[in-house]
């Protein structure tokens, strides 16, 4: 393991020890961001246990969502509720659609080195696609992001070390960086100030040029350190696998939308 830092657990019960350790921690909430416009990101998903949000996810087909593998590594998935169409988690919203998890698919997740931190959850039904619930668009297989690409991170969770959990979905402009980053991750940094992803909301998407390029995985040096980049699982490395999982579903003949013209995009 080349990260050179201790791992700390994700869930909110483990936030305080992880903050004190100041080491590598599973991500991610948004620190230093802003409130998203209601339902601006209709593919955004809240994973919940007993009515409480614990991770983010992305709707990639009407009956499949994508998240971080560590989110469900030690969780009774039968108790997980997948909430679509949410914006303010503290309110009852008529836009929501709620499902249970029927099946999970992993791809060689390595919890020690935090590699292949991706999971696909098959829902026990199919979402109704509308203005508030939509399927995300994924990049072409193998497409890499170059240094300096502007992206958007998002999620629900803690707003900082001494602040509470966000009820309203947060978003944050971030920049892709290749230094201090493994090739097995996509990494981002907010230049010039302390902002980024942190505890309480792993699995949330990283949106670059309208495509989901990352799944929030872990941070180093504490939340929003301004020194170490935040690490995301690289979605483009798994697109063929994702397609193969979705296409196996007999009741979902249409997988996620593809990047319509990969050659026209510069990353």
Curated annotation (Swiss-Prot):
- Quote the annotated effect of residue 43 to L: In SCN1 and CH
Compartment(s) where it occurs, according to its Swiss-Prot or TrEMBL record: Cytoplasmic vesicle, Phagosome
State the disulfide connectivity: 55-71, 151-208, 181-187, 198-223
Consequence recorded when altering residue 139 to L: In SCN1 and CH
Quote the InterPro entries the UniProt record gives.
Peptidase_S1_Elastase_sf (IPR050850), Peptidase_S1_PA (IPR009003), Peptidase_S1_PA_chymotrypsin (IPR043504), Peptidase_S1A (IPR001314), Trypsin_dom (IPR001254), TRYPSIN_HIS (IPR018114), TRYPSIN_SER (IPR033116)
Gene Ontology MF terms in the entry: cytokine binding; endopeptidase activity; heparin binding; peptidase activity; protease binding; serine-type endopeptidase activity; transcription corepressor activity
Alphabetical GO CC annotations of the entry are:
azurophil granule lumen; cell surface; collagen-containing extracellular matrix; cytoplasm; cytosol; extracellular exosome; extracellular region; extracellular space
Q: Which residues form the active site?
A: 70, 117, 202
Describe what happens upon changing residue 61 to V: In SCN1 and CH
Keyword Acyltransferase in annotation: no
**Tagged with keyword Protease:** yes
Q: Which residues are glycosylated?
A: 88, 124, 173
Residue ranges occupied by any Peptidase S1 domain in the UniProt entry: 30-247
Q: In which tissues is it expressed?
A: Bone marrow cells. Neutrophil.
Q: Which residues form the signal peptide?
A: 1-27
For biological process, the GO terms are:
acute inflammatory response to antigenic stimulus; biosynthetic process of antibacterial peptides active against Gram-negative bacteria; defense response to bacterium; extracellular matrix disassembly; intracellular calcium ion homeostasis; leukocyte migration involved in inflammatory response; negative regulation of chemokine production; negative regulation of chemotaxis
This protein's superkingdom? Answer: Eukaryota
Q: What is its EC number?
A: 3.4.21.37
| Catalyzed reactions per annotation | Hydrolysis of proteins, including elastin. Preferential cleavage: Val-|-Xaa > Ala-|-Xaa
> What family is this?
Belongs to the peptidase S1 family. Elastase subfamily.
Linked disorder reads:
Cyclic haematopoiesis: Autosomal dominant disease in which blood-cell production from the bone marrow oscillates with 21-day periodicity. Circulating neutrophils vary between almost normal numbers and zero. During intervals of neutropenia, affected individuals are at risk for opportunistic infection. Monocytes, platelets, lymphocytes and reticulocytes also cycle with the same frequency. Neutropenia, severe congenital 1, autosomal dominant: A disorder of hematopoiesis characterized by maturation arrest of granulopoiesis at the level of promyelocytes with peripheral blood absolute neutrophil counts below 0.5 x 10(9)/l and early onset of severe bacterial infections.
Function description = Serine protease that modifies the functions of natural killer cells, monocytes and granulocytes. Inhibits C5a-dependent neutrophil enzyme release and chemotaxis. Promotes cleavage of GSDMB, thereby inhibiting pyroptosis. Promotes blood coagulation. Through the activation of the platelet fibrinogen receptor integrin alpha-IIb/beta-3, potentiates platelet aggregation induced by a threshold concentration of cathepsin G (CTSG). Cleaves and thus inactivates tissue factor pathway inhibitor (TFPI).
Question: What is the protein named?
Answer: Neutrophil elastase
């Amino acid at each position: 393991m080349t990260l050179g830092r201790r791992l700390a657990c994700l869930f909110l019960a483990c936030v305080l020890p992880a903050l004190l350790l100041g080491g590598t921690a599973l991500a991610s909430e948004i620190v230093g961001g802003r409130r998203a416009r209601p339902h601006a990101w209709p593919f955004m998903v809240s994973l919940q246990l007993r009515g409480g949000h614990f991770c983010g996810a992305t709707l990639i087909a009407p009956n499949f969502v994508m998240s971080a593998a560590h989110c469900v590594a030690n969780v009774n998935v039968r108790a997980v509720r997948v909430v679509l169409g949410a914006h303010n988690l503290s309110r009852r919203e008529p836009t929501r659609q709620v499902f249970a998890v029927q099946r999970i698919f992993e791809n060689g997740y390595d919890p020690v080195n935090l590699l292949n931190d991706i999971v696909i959850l098959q829902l026990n039904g199919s979402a109704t696609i509308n203005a508030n619930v939509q399927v995300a668009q994924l990049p072409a297989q193998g497409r890499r992001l170059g240094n300096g690409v502007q992206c958007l991170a998002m999620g629900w969770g803690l707003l900082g070390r001494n602040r509470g959990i966000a009820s309203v979905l947060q978003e944050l402009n971030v920049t892709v960086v290749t230094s201090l980053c493994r090739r097995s991750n996509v990494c981002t940094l907010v230049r010039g100030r302390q902002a980024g992803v942190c505890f309480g909301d792993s699995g949330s998407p990283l949106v670059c040029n309208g495509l989901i390029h990352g799944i929030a995985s872990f941070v180093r040096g504490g939340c929003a350190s301004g020194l170490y980049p935040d690490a995301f699982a690289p979605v483009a490395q798994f697109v063929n696998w994702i397609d193969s999982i979705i296409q196996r579903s007999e009741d979902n003949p249409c997988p996620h939308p593809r990047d319509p013209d990969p050659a026209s995009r510069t990353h």
